[in-house]
Amino acid sequence: MPPDPRAAASVPPASAAETLAAEFRAVHRAEPLDAHGQPAKSEADLRVAQFEAGATALCLSGGGIRSASFCLGVVQGLARRGLLARFDYLSTVSGGGYIGSLLAAWMYRAGGGAIEVEAALASRERREGDVLDTLRRYVRYLAPRQGFFSVDTWTLVATYVRNLLLNALIWLPLIALAALAPWLVATIVDGVNAALPGADTLRLAALGGSAASLAGLLVGIFMLRNAIARRPTQATGAPGARTHRHIQQALCGSALVLSASTYWLAFAEPDAFWQQLIGTARHVLPWLPVDPHAQPPLLLGLLFIVPHAYLGLAYRSPLLTALRHRVAAMVAGGVVGFITGTAIGWIMTALAHTGAWALPIEAYMTLAPPAFLAAVALGEILFAGAVSRFSTDFDREWWARAGASSTILCIAWAGACAVGYFGPPLLDLVVSWRAGVPTYWIVVALAGAIARLLLRQERPLDRDAQPRARLRVAERAIDAAGALALFAILAGVAWLALRMLDATAYATTLLGWTVAAEELPFSWLDVLAVGAALAVVLVVAGLCVDVNRFSLHGMYRDRLIRTFLGASRARHPTPPWPLDETPPLSEAAQFAPRNPDDFIQFDRDDNPVLRWLAPGRASGTPRKGPFPIVNAALNLVAGRNLAWQERKAASFTFTPLAVGSPILGYRGAADYAAGAGGITLGTAMAVSGAAVSPNAGANSSPIRTFILALCNARLGWWLGHPADPARVRRATPGFAVYPLVSELLGRTDETHPWLFVSDGGHFENLGLYEAVRRGCRDIVVVDASCDPDRNYDDLGNAIRKIRIDLGVRIERAGPWRIGGRELRANGRYCALFDVIYDDERSGSLLYVKAAVYPDADNVPIDVLQYAGRSETFPHESTGRQFFTESQFESYRALGEFELDAIVEGVEMANRPDPTMPASVAEFVEIAAIRMTE
C-alpha cells in the first residue's frame, strides 16, 4: 500500500540534498558516499557520489511535437545499440517530455522493463496498433481529424470558449470594480456637494474633511518618525518596507479626503460667518489676503507647520546631536510644512475653481490627489535640502525612495482614473458610426503603414544585423499594439460598468430611491449597488471556477495523455508488487488493454499516478529503466532574488519520488494532490510543456502577461507550496481570485502558499541543469529546439546557469562543426564538452543538434525532399503543433539518421559486436572519434 499522505505531509519539506540522496539509493541500490567514504550530506558530496558511481543521463529538449518527433528517432537509434537501458536518468523538458513520459509509462507497464521497450523500439517490423502506429495516427494530437467541420476542431473551439467565459466571471467583475473605484470617490464628493445646499454646512464638511486629512498626515508622519528612529538598529529591510506601506496608505487617504474638502470649499460661497472668521484671522495675521480663494491655501499652510515641525524635531541622525541643530531642523520642518501646505491649497483650489474654466469633477478627481502627493514629495525634497548638513547618504537614499513611491502612486491613480473616467467616452467616440468607423480604419491604416515603413527602412550597420534590427522594430510595434489593445480592453470593461451604472440609476429613479447628485447622472448609492453585485459575482465565481481545470491546461493535457501515454497501453503481465487499489484509483487497469470511451476516445486509465513509477516497489525486481525527471519552471516574475530579475524562474521537477524545487524543498510524489489521488504523470508532462503562459520566466512582460491571462491562454498549473502541508495535499486552489490576479499582474513568487509552474523551457530548455545537479559522469543532450539562426541560446543559457548556481564549468572539448545547410557535406551533428565538477572530476557531455546538410552521405531521400519544401526545417516554429504525416516522419527519420551518423564506421576492439558500444561512456568516446575525422 502507498504511504499515508497525511502522515507524510505533516513533516517539513525535504531539502535538495535529502531528495537527491533518496534518488541515489533508488537508482544505484547503494548508499551515497562522499570523497572520504563518509555518507554524503550536501549536494556537492552527492555529485561526487554520483560521479564515482558512473551515473549517466539522457536529456531530451523542449520544442513541442517537433522535438518529440526528432527525439523519438534518436531514442530508436539508441535502442538499436542497446544503450537506452544503460542510462541512469532521463531528464526531459516540454516536447522531449512527451517522448520521455511515453518511455517512462511504457517501461512501467512492460514486464521486462527497459529491455522489452528497447527491443520494441529497435524492431523495424511494423504492426497495427503498436506504439509507433498509434503515434502516427495521433500526430495531430490536439485535433487528430482535420477539417473545418471536424468535431475535434470544434471541440477545441467549444472548450476554449467555455473556459474563457468562466474565467471572465472572475476578471470582468474584478476590472469593473477597479474601474468603479474612481467613480465612487467622485460620486461621494458630488453627492455631498449636492446634499449640503447651505454654505455653512458645506464649509463645515470641508473643514471636517481637512481635519481628517490632517489627522491622516499626522499618522503618516508619526509612523515616519518611528521608522527613522528605529532605522539604524534594523538588520533587515522588511519592517521598514512594511512601515513605508502604512505611510503610503495614510498619505493616499489624506490625498483623497483633502481633495474632496477643497472641492467642497470651492463651492461654498463666502457668507457672514466665513467673513467674520476670516476677519478674526486677519487681526492675528494681518498679511492674510482679502481674496477668499487665496485664504484657504494660506490657512492650510499654517496647519501644516505643526506636523512638519514635529517631524523636524523627531528627526534622528548621527550628525544631529547639538540642541541648536535640532531646533534648526524643527524650524526647517515648519517652513517646509508651510510651503507644502500652501502649495497643496493653491493647486487644489485652482483645480476646483468655479470660474469659466472650471474642470469637470472627473478631471478634478484625476488631478487633485496626485497633486497632493506631488506637493508632499516636494516637501520631502525641500526638507532633505534643509537638513542636508546633518543627514547621511543613507538618509538621502531613504528620502529618494520615498519620493519614488509617491511618484508611482500618482501614476497609478492617474492611470486608473484615465481608464475609468475617460476610457468609456473615448470608446464611444471610436465605435460611433459617424466618427468611429473612419477613425478606426485611419488608425489601423496608419499603424500598418508606419510599421511597414519602419521594417523596410530600418538601416542596420551591417547585413548580419539586419534580421535582428527588424526583429527589434517588430517587437516594439507589437508592444505598442499590445498597449493599445490593453487600454481598449480595460476601457471596454469600464464602459460596461458605466452602462450598468446608468441602468441602476434609471431603476433607482423608478423606485424612488434617489440620492442627491450635482454634476453626475448617478449617485454613490448606484455605484455601491453595482459594486456589491459585482463583488457577489466575483466571490461566487472565485469559489466555483477552478483556476486550474478551466484554463487550457486540461484540454492540452488530456490530448497529450491520449497520444503519448495511451500509446503504451496493451495487455501486460501483472507486476510482482502490491497494486494500489485505493479508490478512486485502480493500478491494475494500467496493465489491461486500452478501453477508450466511444464518443470522446479518451481512457481515464491512460494516465498513471506519478508515484507508481518509483523504482524498487518490490524487492528483487530489476530497475524499470532510466529514472524519469520531468523538468518545469517555477515562475518568479515578482520574486525577491534581485539576481534573478532576468531569469524570473527557478527549476521545478517532477519525479516518481519527489516534487519540488531546490530553493523551496521537496515533497514526496505521494503527498502532492494526495486528496485527489496523487499527481499524475500526465499532469507533470503537460506542465513541463506549458509553453503558452502569461508568466513565462524570462519571456514575461507586463502587457503580454495581462493580455494572455485575459484571453485565458494559460497552460500552466498552480501547485501547493512544499512548505505548506495542507495545500500540498490539494489539487487546486480553493479560491481562484488570487491566483488569477497573480497571473494577470505578473505577481508570481516563491512566498505565497500557491506556486505557478509552467514550461521547463521558461527556465532551462535542455534538461541539462538537473542532470548536472545530479553529478552525472556522461551526459547525452538531444537539442531539437527552434534555432533557425543557430544562436544556440538554450545551450548557452544552460551552461551559464549551471556555472552560476552549481559552480560546475562546461567547456568545449573538440571541434565545433554544427551549422546550417551552407556547410553542405562538412557539417557535424554533435559536439563534445567537458563537464568540470572539480579539479579531480571531469565528465563528458555529448551535444546532439538537429541539422540538415544536403550533401552529407546517406541522408534519407525523403528527409531531403521535405527539407526542400521547408526552408526552416529542422527548425520550424514551435507554434506549428498540427503536424502532418510527412512532417512527423521527416523529423523522426532525421533523429534516427543523426544517431547512426554519429557512430557509423567506428569499431571498438574486443567486443562480440564491434559496432555496438558496451556503455554510454563508449558511445561518447565513439562520437569523439568521429568528430576528429
Name these PLM-found stretches.
Residues 1-933:
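Catalytic domains of lipid- and phosphate-ester/thioester hydrolases
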